[in-house]
UniProtKB/Swiss-Prot annotation:
Entry domain remark: The presence of a 'disulfide through disulfide knot' structurally defines this protein as a knottin.
Cross-link Cyclopeptide (Gly-Asn): residue positions: 1-30
Modified how: This is a cyclic peptide.
Keyword ATP-binding: no
Protein name: Varv peptide H
Entry keyword set: Disulfide bond, Knottin, Plant defense
Similarity remark: Belongs to the cyclotide family. Moebius subfamily.
UniProt entry tagged with the keyword Heme: no
Superkingdom of origin organism: Eukaryota
Organism encoding this protein: Viola arvensis (European field pansy)
Entry's Gene Ontology BP terms: defense response
Length: 30
């Protein structure tokens, strides 16, 4: 399946592909 977006994002970027930091401080599916 798709990678889970749940890491904390720093600098407005997420390491997981397809994830967004708009829900800072935790990445979510964009």
């Amino acid at each position: 399946g798709l990678p889970v977006c749940g890491e904390t994002c720093f600098g407005g970027t997420c390491n997981t592909p397809g994830c967004s930091c708009e829900t800072w401080p935790v990445c979510s599916r964009n």
